Design a protein with these regions (language model features):
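Sec-dependent N-terminal signal peptides
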Residues: 4-14
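Amphipathic, charged alpha-helical segments and their helix-to-coil junctions
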Residues: 19-165
Length: 165
């Protein structure tokens, strides 16, 4: 059994060398940035960001108003219990503002990932189709290439032709 395993391992490199490797690379990010779906996604993200910024500004204005009222109240030598109550309101509002800021950033990130996923899947499917149609052994993302030989084929233009309208 051990001899059979060693024989298979010994001849494996020869069988791999006998196959012609057809290599290609693609700049999928460049194509994604030019797709109409990506531009639609960016508009949705910008609209959502604008909405969140509007809400955030309202909260900040409310905080500034409460702070100003508190400062005015301090000048009148108001009862200590009232001052403590207002100070607590301001602290709670500051916490709400910080939570809103954090949550809105997370929601924005989540929405962007949600909208980008089908675009990336479409690009991946199209790259697979091109690879099968043209008989490529491997297709690499251009970002990971340290070296490319003259025999490697750039499929970016083909991918653009199929996806960018």
């Amino acid at each position: 059994m051990k001899k059979i395993f060693l024989a298979i391992i010994a001849f494996l490199p020869l069988s791999l060398m006998a196959q012609e490797l057809k290599l290609a690379y693609v700049n999928a990010n460049e194509v994604i940035m030019q797709m109409s779906e990506t531009q639609d996604m960016q508009k949705q993200i910008t609209d959502l960001q604008t909405m969140y910024e509007g809400e955030y500004m309202k909260l900040l204005e409310e905080g500034q108003k409460k702070m100003k009222e508190f400062e005015e109240l301090q000048k009148t030598n108001a009862d200590q219990a009232i001052l403590q109550s207002r100070a607590e309101e301001i602290r709670n509002l500051e916490q709400r503002i910080e939570m809103f800021r954090t949550n809105s950033q997370e929601q924005l990130q989540k929405k962007q990932e949600e909208l980008l996923k089908p675009i990336q899947e479409k690009v991946s499917r199209t790259i697979n189709e091109i690879g099968i149609e043209k008989g490529f052994t491997y297709i690499f993302p251009v970002e990971v290439l340290l070296f490319k030989s003259s025999s490697a084929v750039d499929l970016t233009a083909e991918l653009k032709k199929r996806l960018v309208k």
